[in-house]
Amino acid sequence: MAYLLQNGRPVLASPISSGRYGHLTKGGSFKILEKERTHYSSMYGRIVDARGNTIVADADADMPVPPGGKFIPAPMHYFMRFCGADGMHAGYLPGYPASHGCVRMPEQYAIAFFNSVGVGTPVSVFGRTSAGRYYSDRSQSAFLRRPRFGPPIGPRLAPPPPPWWR
């Protein structure tokens, strides 16, 4: 979960997908270094053939591209960089850590966070990523039994951000 704090209290909670095994999201204390509403990855994306069909869905920019094909950078809208190439942005949440190190969140929450923070806003990243692709039910249950900010707010229970955050 990502929490937006105001005066030390959580005012918004968003489900996230963080860095997968081998591309863990770096933990620590950071600050927002840059904000970009429409950002594209310079390192990751997909490769399409001459007809536009995806032939490599999780491609690195330095992978060979077939004749007539091209590399299409991954969109990272509402990007808030906080450490090197890592940041928070709108993206797909499969229910487990799946990114290359960034913190993905649903677009409505990314917009709310983006509109609420400025360059220099503190960011704290903590927690662990499971060694496997999916979190086990046991580790999810253990996390839910030990909430750090009171009862967790699941994506189905959390109301969408108010219109003034957009």
Label every PLM stretch briefly.
Residues H23-G27, R46-R166:
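Exported/periplasmic cell-wall-interacting domains
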Residues M1-E34:
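Glycine-rich catalytic cores of cysteine/serine-nucleophile enzymes that process amide/ester linkages
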Residues G8, K35-E36, A85, Q108:
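Short loop segments at secondary-structure junctions
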Residues H39-R46:
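Short acidic, Gly/Pro-enriched loop/turn segments at secondary-structure junctions
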Residues V11, S41, G132:
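Flexible, glycine-rich phosphate/dinucleotide-binding loops
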Residues S17, E34, S41, P73-A74, ...:
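Hydrophobic alpha-helical segments and their boundary regions
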Residues R37-H39, P94:
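Active-site/binding-pocket entry motifs
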